[in-house]
Structure formats: C-alpha cells, structure tokens
C-alpha cells in the first residue's frame, strides 16, 4: 500500500460487509441495490428502480471521491457502480474468484478494463475483456503473521489438544449449523471445537445440545479479531466453499472439509477442488443425515497435511501482491 492510497467501499445498507469494513476503519457508503434474479418474481418489476437508484448513487459517490480505479468482486451492488465508472471513464477491474462467473460479473464485463481470476477455465468466459491476469488468492495481511499461540490465549484453547474449526460464513451459517449438529458430540471425543455459529446461531443450538457444557466446545457468533490466529491453530476446518476462506486456507495449507451452500457457485468450487485431491467435499444433506458414517470413512482415509499441501499447489501464494501491482499499473498509466 502506498502512503497516499485512499479507499472507499460501496456496499449494501444492511449487508454483512458493512460491519467488517467499518471495523477495518475503511470509509463505507451504502447504495441501493436490486437483486439480479434468473427466476420469476414480482420483485423483478421493482428491482430495476433500485438498480437505477444504485447507478445514480454510485455516480454521485464516484464524482465526489474521484477514484483512479474501481474494483468489483461480483456483488449485486457492483453492477450500477461499474457502469457509473464507465460513464466517468474510470478504469474498472473484475476480481473473479469463483470457478463459475456469476451474473453480476457477466453484466459488468462489457464495461470492464481488466479481469483478475484464480482459475484458468474462467478467463475464456469473458471474451470482451482483453487484459486478463491469473493470480493466487487475495487474502488479509493478518494471515501471514498468524500465530496459533495467540489463538490459545484469545479463545481459551488447550495448547496440545487438536482443534476443529467449523465456520459457515454469513448467509450459510444456519444450514451448516443444522447439518453439523448431530456430529458435534462425536468430534469432541478427540478434538476441541471452535464453532462460528453466525449471528443468532448459538440461540438455535443451545436448547438442543449438551455440547454447550463441554469444556472443549467453544461456540462463537462471529470473530472480529484473531481469525488468522484461529486458522493457524486449526488442524481441520469445516467450511463453506467461498473462495475468500478457501484462499486463506490454501496459504496456510490446512486440511479442509467443504460443505458448499446448496444450489450455488460454491458447489462448482468444491467439486473442482475435490477432483484435484485438495479437500474433501460433502453435501449439507449427507452431513445432516449420515454425518457420523461419513466422518468415520473420512477419518480412516485421512493423511494429515496431504490435502492442505495440495490446496496450496492449486491456489499459490503471492496473489495479494500481484493484485496490488496490477492496480498501481493501471492507475499509473491513466
């Protein structure tokens, strides 16, 4: 980061990103956003008004902030902002992390100057963009300085007992909580467990589970500080298959079990990574209905560290620096 670099994050008013961005002390501005649906809904008649409003709001924020470059990673909020950037002749970059491009990124492609991607097969799906660059995962700086010892202190963990981390992200936490619930007591036989339940998730699980009284079970709604340390401490991570968390796990070479959010691009991510022997993939339904049987098979065949190393081979280090270099390359050439 250059000393003079300034940032503005444009997002939805009530989205999960707002809290994280504000805690990182990055200026945040909310803009209206419609949902780009592929299916029939009465809201399809209303959403164009929100999209238009998002375009006007995006235009006003860009006029005021005067950025040298705009970066989008595929949210619905991004589309009107990308077109506002095109209107103002501000370079726009798409960060395509997932294997399968979403509708938002496809709609932004005609007005984008560059594409940054993780998987080779993704590049061919954006024929209108001439400048393309494959990089490794873009991750938080704290991943590189993470220490397991700090996680022991912060979260009250036993320094010697192995750890399983369960995390479902924002929208995907509730379904994962329900699926993993029957398996918890069996995991606690050999492991301590940190379970990121999501907001309100602990209230759902507590009346049902005797695990809450177990000394090695640590339910936490969200982690605002120390997530890198927690990942460093973990021996196995059960997670959704979003590329944000997967990139961090790849850098740390962690053995990972993927439970993708059903019916989403995460299933494509998980399937590709499993086919390359870089993580295990189990559906949410199978985990809920046959979790113990599945776990026994997994545990019998597991070779500690093998899949974590393979994940790192697929998603190699250096992406954060490469992405920053591209941004400055584009801004310096304006």
Tell what function each PLM region has.
Residues 72-73, 227-268:
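A donor-sugar binding/catalytic signature common to diverse glycosyltransferases
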Residues 40-69:
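An amphipathic, basic-hydrophobic alpha-helix
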Residues 16, 27, 86-149:
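Active-site-proximal region of nucleotide-activated glycan assembly enzymes
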Residues 20-24, 148-153, 157-236, 246, ...:
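Donor-nucleotide binding loops and adjacent catalytic segments primarily
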Residues 3-50, 135-136, 283-286:
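Conserved nucleotide-sugar phosphate-binding/catalytic loop shared by glycosyltransferases and other
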Residues 303-317:
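A short, well-ordered alpha-helix in the C-terminal region of glycosyltransferases
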Residues 297, 316-334:
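C-terminal alpha-helical cap of glycosyltransferases
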Residues 15-19, 58, 67-88:
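An aromatic- and histidine-rich active-site surface loop
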């Amino acid at each position: 980061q250059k000393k003079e670099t300034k940032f503005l994050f444009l997002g939805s008013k009530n989205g999960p990103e707002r809290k994280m961005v504000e805690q990182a002390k990055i200026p945040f501005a909310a803009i209206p956003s419609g949902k780009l649906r592929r299916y029939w809904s009465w809201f399809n008649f209303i959403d164009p008004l929100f999209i238009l409003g998002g375009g006007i709001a995006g235009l006003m924020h860009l006029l005021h902030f005067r950025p040298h470059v705009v970066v989008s990673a595929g949210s619905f909020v991004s589309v009107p902002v990308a077109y506002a950037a095109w209107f103002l002749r501000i370079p726009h970059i798409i960060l395509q992390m997932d294997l399968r491009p979403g509708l938002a990124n496809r709609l932004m492609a005609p007005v984008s100057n560059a594409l940054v991607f993780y998987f080779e097969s993704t590049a061919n799906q954006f024929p209108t963009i001439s400048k393309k660059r494959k990089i490794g995962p873009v991750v938080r700086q704290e991943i590189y300085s993470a220490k397991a010892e700090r996680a022991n202190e912060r979260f009250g963990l036993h320094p010697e007992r192995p750890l399983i981390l369960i995390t479902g992200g924002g929208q995907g936490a509730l379904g994962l909580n329900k699926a993993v619930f029957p398996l918890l007591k069996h995991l606690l036989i050999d492991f301590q467990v940190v379970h990121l339940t999501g907001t309100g998730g602990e209230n759902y699980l507590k009346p049902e589970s005797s695990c809450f009284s177990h000394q090695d079970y640590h339910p936490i709604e969200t982690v605002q500080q120390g997530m890198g340390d927690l990942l460093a401490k973990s021996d196995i991570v059960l997670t959704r298959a979003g590329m944000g968390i997967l990139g961090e796990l790849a850098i740390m070479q962690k053995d990972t079990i993927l439970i993708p959010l059903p019916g989403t691009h995460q299933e494509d991510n998980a399937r590709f990574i499993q086919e390359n022997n870089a993580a295990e993939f189990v559906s949410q339904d199978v985990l809920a209905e046959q979790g113990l049987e599945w776990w026994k098979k997994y545990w019998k065949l597991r070779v500690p560290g093998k899949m974590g190393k393979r994940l790192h081979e697929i998603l190699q280090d250096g992406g954060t620096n490469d992405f920053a270099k591209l941004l400055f390359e584009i801004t310096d050439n304006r």
